[in-house]
């Protein structure tokens, strides 16, 4: 689960954050302002300060927020002076926007606010449709407006060129005041409340936010154009309301509720992608007539409310079709306010103690939760007082009698490891005097539940110099006095508390003072042991899973307030004695438990072991169907001590019992074949791989399949003597289901003569789920999931269904992934009713997949396999290729055809893509690399002779938004690296690759190719981009760079090789076609070429997604001359960039090679 942050405001206006991975409240970095309330998302936080002004806090990131400004220079040709800026009266402006209707001179483009800065000056964009233009960047046309081309023709009467300039948002990690360009007479009055949400409105562009605010006069305002690239928005819009609003809440989706002065609730209806402000209001009555609604908070599909008597209510029946719900349900507890987070988790602020509470037990099936739990996390400033006391105190207990009193702290340690509740009202904490001179200031301490009445006055007294306020101790114990020597008897006594400040009208808390001192001139509103009084909490940017609750509800073991102040000084000699004593005790225990029993004989000793079971088998003959079989795995030990196994499959044909057997030392892959109905897996042997017809077996349950898969995989590894983590030179691959496979390369795999056939490579599965993987010969492996999350390999093996002996005991972590399932709604036009779902008999299904050949309805479509679960409803996907209209439709003349987003007179059919998200949770040797989502990643391939220990490993990546990034600090000891370095580009990129000599090539979203110059270990980001012309009439989508070779893949599946690359001219000269039918390419450190072929015909079947190896690749023939086919049937990705294993040299390699045979594409159909 990625780290996220909970935001809170105390009564003094200070803003704090609490990370899901931490246990301390951290004071906001920019703490100069005092705030009333805040509303947070994952990337920013909006707030209303005490001056009633709106501020936004954008969290810092390695990727900057950049906006591109464009201006077009237009010229017309005349017979006297040629092209010039003198235009006709009917022409557009000489300097305009892309439409030509708006005047846009370069000096007239200004920054929108002081929070932006220019990156550079204006410059000409010399990229036109993915192709470089001539020097100057001019494009030509017959007239304005028309179709422009980069070539000048005889009838080119006008021309234009695009000037671009980037501005960068600089106010990050500080509170930036929201500017306003509105008329001062129309500016909104001071704001009283605001709420941020709407980032998951169905079909909405990624990064867009909805910011709603309420003014002191009860008016509702909406902030226009707020997005990730424009965090401030542009202007405020006023919305009409049926009454005066006092508070508002916006959820992540299309749910928006507000509170009226009269105690009723307002619900906004009609919120969608095209109208994020909604269309109408509906009124919801409060739970009771006596006490109206004071506060409301909404989430994805829940509504919580607090009435004026502090009661908490839950709204039943909330969904996307009924945002008003059906009825109110009262919850236990009294809160001043509640807030709903990203996944309907709920936080609140207690009515009496002003502490932050979390609603436990909130799940998709039980949205109301079960109970309230207080968050007992301390403040970050308190950590300095307790940084080493816990570890040193526990270390001292190992010395036995050297530290007395360790047994006394044991009960406290046991209690502190469990979840604790705050002391209730009236509970007092015992205290003893520390010094007689301070007895006059001593008072009894009470818990946070003991509050004053409104008649109580605030004592106008300050702590005496040298004293410090502290919060109540949640584990009261016997008070003692600290001793003078660190390694003698330890006694601690806690002094009484000096009365502290409290706000009138709010509960006052008292506690024991601590032993720490403040420097002169420094004061804090809370002492070390005080829990701050909260006024507001926001969980809009906090993601908490019900199965993985943060460590916010436990106190660190053995740490009372007095122990926090304790400082034990351990000398090196004492540390050495402690370690030696522990080692000696462990050695003696080993002798007692093992040495004394080694003379016993083994209870059971046998050389054959058999496991039997019932499975289903996909029979080899027609009609192909699943038949019930009995299977038996027989494992035996050979004469040489090696273990081998045979799998027997017993079946019945025409009442005759038969069987087939498979030697597991011949199995090259065990692949799960998960679908909607069967828990099946496939066994590949070299012969079955060539046939494209594996042995398929299915189990009754998922657990049975996992057991058999783990057992067979372990037996195969034992037969081949493969165990442990993969070697640094391993070849990694990914299937279309996201399964990860790894193969240990043989030295003969890249031999020029008699190379090892690909169908004999042994592939074993690793735990986890990825979309792509990239490896390096120094053991650094990165992966990217379907949800663009980056993962780094931890060095373990196993995970997922591989448990016990088939998995390492460490370096295995939880991993999740999210992907979208797409279906299409098809319609045909008729002259009577227009577009309807009634098509011709020859048409495709009206609800189908992308091909139209398979029927896929919204009700009948299931997740990809039983391991996936739906996490969203169906929504319209507007990001399909070709574009859509405002409703998501694409038009064409007929099925199937080329689709486009605008309707014409010749379009008789249309389709609309629907998507639904599903989630998978598994485990594997992978750790998440937050916080930037990635689209592509490339690690430098290193040849065997390269010196890799003297510098860090170069790693480049492309974010999901198209930003180019360079990872710093990557090494064998720190494979995740330390930080990202942003590399500026003029447009979004999709693919990137770095070669063994630091040559960086990339592909932009429009299919154009770029080369990054001057990349060195001392200059990891290089200096500039060089635009490389793409192959004629082709749009590239992927590039891979080896030691000296550069290969690229276009959108039509054609593989291209870059000719003419030399050290003095690394950009090369031209592209040469190598093959078609390719889906993915990977070039290794030896310039070896491996691809994933789209279709490969075997002797029995056709497989899609096959691993292929380019044969005959040599220095004098870098393109090779043929293909060798390996494992196939559902493979999506391969990475050979870690395989730097050279083949042994033969005597014939010195001879001149004969003429190469004719090259063939990797297709046999």
Curated annotation (Swiss-Prot):
Q: What is its main location?
A: membrane
Subcellular location(s): the record lists: Cytoplasmic vesicle, Autophagosome membrane; Lysosome membrane
Q: Mark the residues carrying the PTM Phosphoserine.
A: 938, 949
Q: Which UniProt keywords apply?
A: Autophagy, Cytoplasmic vesicle, Lipid-binding, Lysosome, Membrane, Phosphoprotein, Repeat
| Matches recorded under Gene3D superfamilies | Pleckstrin-homology domain (PH domain)/Phosphotyrosine-binding domain (PTB)
Which PANTHER family did the record assign?
Answer: DYSFERLIN-RELATED, TECTONIN BETA-PROPELLER REPEAT-CONTAINING PROTEIN 1
**Member of which family?**
Belongs to the TECPR1 family.
This chain belongs to the protein called Tectonin beta-propeller repeat-containing protein 1
Q: Which organism is it from?
A: Pongo abelii (Sumatran orangutan)
Q: Which gene encodes it?
A: TECPR1
């Amino acid at each position: 689960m990625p780290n996220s942050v909970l935001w809170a405001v105390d009564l003094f206006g200070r803003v704090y954050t609490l990370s899901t991975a931490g246990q301390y409240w951290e004071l906001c970095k920019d703490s100069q302002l005092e705030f009333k309330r805040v509303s947070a998302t994952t990337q920013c936080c909006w707030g209303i300060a005490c001056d009633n002004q709106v501020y936004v806090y954008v969290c810092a990131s390695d990727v900057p927020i950049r906006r591109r400004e464009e201006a077009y220079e237009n010229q017309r040709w005349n017979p006297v002076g040629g092209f010039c800026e003198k235009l006709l009266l009917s022409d557009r402006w000489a300097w305009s926007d892309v439409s030509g209707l708006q005047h846009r001179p370069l000096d007239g483009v200004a920054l929108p606010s002081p929070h932006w800065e220019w990156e550079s000056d204006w410059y000409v964009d010399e990229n036109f449709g993915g192709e470089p233009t001539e020097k100057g960047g001019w494009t030509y046309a017959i007239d304005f407006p028309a179709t422009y081309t980069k070539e000048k023709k005889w009838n080119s009467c006008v021309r234009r060129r695009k000037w671009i300039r980037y501005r960068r948002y600089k106010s990050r990690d500080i509170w930036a005041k929201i500017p306003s360009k509105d008329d001062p007479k129309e500016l909104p009055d001071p704001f009283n409340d605001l709420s941020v949400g709407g980032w998951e409105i169905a079909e909405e562009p990624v990064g867009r936010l909805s910011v709603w605010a309420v003014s002191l006069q009860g008016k509702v305002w909406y902030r226009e154009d707020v997005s990730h690239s424009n965090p401030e928005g542009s202007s405020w819009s006023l919305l009409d309301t049926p009454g005066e609003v006092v508070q508002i809440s916006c959820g992540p989706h299309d749910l928006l509720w507000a509170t009226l002065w009269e105690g009723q609730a307002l619900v906004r209806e009609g919120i969608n992608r095209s109208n994020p402000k909604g269309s109408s209001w509906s009124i919801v009555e409060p739970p009771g007539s006596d006490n109206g609604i004071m506060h409301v908070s909404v989430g994805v599909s829940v509504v919580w409310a607090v009435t004026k008597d502090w009661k908490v209510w839950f709204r039943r029946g909330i969904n996307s079709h009924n945002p008003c719900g059906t009825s109110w349900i009262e919850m236990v507890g009294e809160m001043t306010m509640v807030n709903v987070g990203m996944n309907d988790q709920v936080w609140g602020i207690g009515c009496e103690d002003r502490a932050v509470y979390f609603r436990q037990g909130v799940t998709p099936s039980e949205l109301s939760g079960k109970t309230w739990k207080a968050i007992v996390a301390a403040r970050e400033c308190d950590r300095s007082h307790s940084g080493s006391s816990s570890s040193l105190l526990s270390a001292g207990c190992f010395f036995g009698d050297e530290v007395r009193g360790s047994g006394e702290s044991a009960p406290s340690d046991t209690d502190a490891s469990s979840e604790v509740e705050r002391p209730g009202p009236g509970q007092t904490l015992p205290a003893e005097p520390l010094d007689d001179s301070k007895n006059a200031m001593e008072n009894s301490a009470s818990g946070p539940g003991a509050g004053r009445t409104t008649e109580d006055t605030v004592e106008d007294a300050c702590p005496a110099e040298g004293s410090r306020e502290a919060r109540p101790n949640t584990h009261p114990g016997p008070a003692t006095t600290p001793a003078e020597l660190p390694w003698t008897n330890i006694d601690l006594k806690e002094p009484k508390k000096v009365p502290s400040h409290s706000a009138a009208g709010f509960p006052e808390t008292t506690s024991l003072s601590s032993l720490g001192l403040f420097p002169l001139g420094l004061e804090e509103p809370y002492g070390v042991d005080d829990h701050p009084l909260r006024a507001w909490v926001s969980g809009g940017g906090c993601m908490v899973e019900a199965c993985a609750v943060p460590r916010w509800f436990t106190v660190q073991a053995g740490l009372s307030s007095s122990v926090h102040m304790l400082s034990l000084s351990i000398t090196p000699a004492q540390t050495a004695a402690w370690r030696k004593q522990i080692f000696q005790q462990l050695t003696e225990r080993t002798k007692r438990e093992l040495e004394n029993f080694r003379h016993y004989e083994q209870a059971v000793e046998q050389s054959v072991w058999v496991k039997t079971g019932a499975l289903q088998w996909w029979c080899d003959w027609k009609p192909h169907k699943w038949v019930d079989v009995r299977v038996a795995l027989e494992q035996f030990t050979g004469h040489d001590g090696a273990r081998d196994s045979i799998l027997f499959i017993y079946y019945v044909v025409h009442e005759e019992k038969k069987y087939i057997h498979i030697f597991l030392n011949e199995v090259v892959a065990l692949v799960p074949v998960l679908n909607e109905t069967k828990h099946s897996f496939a066994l590949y042997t070299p012969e079955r791989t060539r046939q494209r017809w594996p042995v398929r077996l299915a189990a009754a349950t998922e657990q049975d399949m996992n057991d058999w898969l783990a057992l067979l995989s372990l037996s195969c590894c034992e037969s081949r003597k493969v165990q442990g983590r993969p070697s640094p030179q391993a070849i990694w691959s990914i299937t279309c289901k996201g399964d990860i496979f790894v193969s240990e390369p043989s030295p003969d795999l890249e031999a020029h003569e008699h190379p090892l056939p690909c169908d004999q490579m042994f592939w074993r599965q690793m735990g986890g789920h990825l979309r792509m993987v990239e490896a390096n010969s120094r053991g650094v492996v990165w992966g990217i999931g379907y949800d663009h999350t980056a993962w780094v390999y931890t060095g373990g093996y196993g995970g997922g269904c591989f448990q016990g002996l088939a998995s390492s005991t460490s370096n295995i972590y939880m991993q999740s992934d999210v992907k979208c399932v797409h279906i299409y709604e098809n319609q045909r036009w008729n002259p009577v009713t227009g577009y309807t779902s009634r098509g011709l008999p020859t048409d495709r299904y009206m609800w189908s997949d992308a091909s139209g050949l398979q029927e896929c309805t919204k009700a009948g479509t299931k997740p990809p396999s039983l391991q996936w679960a739906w996490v969203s409803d169906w929504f319209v996907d507007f990001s399909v290729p070709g574009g859509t209209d405002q409703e998501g439709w694409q038009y064409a003349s007929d099925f199937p055809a080329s689709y486009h987003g605008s309707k014409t007179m010749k379009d008789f059919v249309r389709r609309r893509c629907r998507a639904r998200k599903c989630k998978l949770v598994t485990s594997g040797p992978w750790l998440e690399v937050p916080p930037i989502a990635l689209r592509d990643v490339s690690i430098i391939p290193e040849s065997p002779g390269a010196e890799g220990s003297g510098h860090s490993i170069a790693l480049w990546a492309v974010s999901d938004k198209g930003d180019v990034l360079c990872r710093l600090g990557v090494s064998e000891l720190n494979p995740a690296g330390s930080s990202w370095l942003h590399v500026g580009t003029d447009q979004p990129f999709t693919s990137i690759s770095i070669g063994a000599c630091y040559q960086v090539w990339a592909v932009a979203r429009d299919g154009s190719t770029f080369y990054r110059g001057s990349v060195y270990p001392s200059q990891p980001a290089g200096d500039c981009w060089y635009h490389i012309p793409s192959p004629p009439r082709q749009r590239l989508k992927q590039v891979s760079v080896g030691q000296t070779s550069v290969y690229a893949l276009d959108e039509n599946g054609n593989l291209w090789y870059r000719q003419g690359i030399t050290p003095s001219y690394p950009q090369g000269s031209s592209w040469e076609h190598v093959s078609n039918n390719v889906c993915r390419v990977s070039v290794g450190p030896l310039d070896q070429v491996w691809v994933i072929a789209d279709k490969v015909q075997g002797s029995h079947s056709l497989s899609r997604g096959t691993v292929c190896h380019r044969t005959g690749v040599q220095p004098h023939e870098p393109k090779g001359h043929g293909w060798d086919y390996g494992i196939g049937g559902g493979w999506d990705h391969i990475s050979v960039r870690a395989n730097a294993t050279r083949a042994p040299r033969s005597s014939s390699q010195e001879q001149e090679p004969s003429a190469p045979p004719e090259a063939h594409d990797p297709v046999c159909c």
